From Swiss-Prot:
The gene is HAL22. The lineage of its organism: Eukaryota, Fungi, Dikarya, Ascomycota, Saccharomycotina. Its EC number is 3.1.3.7. Belongs to the inositol monophosphatase superfamily. It comes from Candida albicans (strain SC5314 / ATCC MYA-2876). This is 3'(2'),5'-bisphosphate nucleotidase 2. One of its GO terms (biological process) is phosphatidylinositol phosphate biosynthetic process.
Length: 358
């Protein structure tokens, strides 16, 4: 299927502009939080900046989807109850949305505008779908990587379209991600990346803060590498130890054949679905997210967009048994953990996971 003939052109345009607008808002908010923290006026327990960012991002994107595809459902992370109980937060959020709509006024004809709090509440609550294996719905994570967002580090705005339980389109805005990631310390190139994938078409990279929605033909096609030798491989993992079992992941790398003297340099720690973007663009080879406990179930919005990005760039994604992730199970995945790798080593990675988890 070519760049210009795929059946999701309108969906991709709407998703791209909505994610760009939400990414710009969350980037500005994250930067201001970091500055406030440096001045000592932000307390550790103050969750309001994240709350505002989450709600504003979800409102912008949900509004754009419902404006263009009124029959589509949305599985979103937030509902508006907390916001309606705190009019101060709601006022701050509406000010941010109004500001960003003016700064991206060229997008208004396609993604629309929000003008009052009730409209914002309604848009947020469009995200109440339970998902499922039939029909068409979107999965949204308005700010993926909360800790990274607060640190001024990596976070992402993630949107995916799911049809009959299968992801067919994904868009991930990465406001703080450099184009080139060599190690935890070495980042270079343009900061701010937009990663998109369409089923049967491919995965693509473009500059996040470049105005408008570039057609795929003008974007950079990205592909995973086919490295197989452990000395060549790089692994992406989360930063927060509460989200995945780093100790188990260390054992898996050893079992796979990583050299203990170099494995630390071969591991890149990143918050959010930017890990999928680094993998899909060929800058890493394995993504490990082992469950911290056996009862935890991943949310679909944490993986849907990244899932199609990996497949369309030539990789493979599964749970700890290697089975494909099931996005038709409702709001959560019915499996444990997430593993992604290039197709040449995926089965070997799963073998190592199985050995360690015995």
């Amino acid at each position: 299927m070519s760049h210009s003939t795929h059946p999701y052109q309108k969906e991709l345009e709407v998703a791209t502009l909505a994610v760009k607008r939400a990414s710009l808002l969350t980037k500005q908010l994250s930067d201001s939080i970091v500055q406030t923290a440096k001045s000592g006026t932000l307390t550790k327990d103050d969750k309001s900046p994240v709350t505002i960012g989450d709600f504003a991002s979800q409102a912008i994107i949900n509004h754009a989807i419902k404006l263009n595809f009124p029959n589509d459902e949305i599985v979103g992370e937030e509902d508006s109850r907390e916001l309606q109980e705190n009019t101060g937060l709601a006022d701050q959020m509406l000010q941010l949305i109004t500001k960003i709509q003016k700064e991206t006024s060229g997008y208004n004809d396609i993604v629309g505008t929000l003008t009052d709090k009730n409209e914002v509440y309604q848009s947020i609550d469009f995200g109440n779908s339970q998902g499922g294996s039939k029909g068409r719905f979107w999965a949204l994570d308005p700010i993926d990587g909360t800790k990274g967002f607060l640190r001024g580090d990596q976070f992402a705005v993630c949107l995916a379209l799911i049809e009959d339980g299968k992801v067919v389109l994904g868009v991930i805005g990465c406001p703080n991600l450099s184009e080139n990631i060599v190690s935890n310390e070495e980042h270079s190139g343009v900061v701010g990346g937009l990663y998109s994938a369409v089923k049967g078409v491919g995965s693509f990279y473009s500059e996040l803060f470049k105005e408008g929605a570039e057609p795929l033909s003008q974007q950079k096609r990205i592909k995973m590498q086919n490295h197989t030798n452990p000395s060549q491989l790089k692994v992406v993992e989360g930063v927060e130890k509460g989200h995945s079992s780093h100790s188990t992941q260390t054992e898996i790398k050893a079992k796979f054949g990583f050299d203990s003297a170099t494995v630390a340099k071969q591991t890149i720690n990143l918050d959010s679905q930017v890990k999928y973007c680094v993998l899909a663009s060929g800058q890493a080879d394995i993504y490990l997210r082992l469950p911290v406990n056996e009862t935890y179930r991943e949310k679909i919005w944490d993986h849907a967009a990244g899932n199609i990005l990996i497949y369309e760039s030539g990789g493979q994604v599964g749970d700890v048994t290697g089975s494909p992730l099931n996005f038709g199970n409702g709001r959560t995945l019915d499996s444990k953990g997430v593993i992604a790798a290039n197709k040449g080593i995926f089965d070997k990675v799963i073998d190592a996971v199985t050995e360690v988890r015995k």
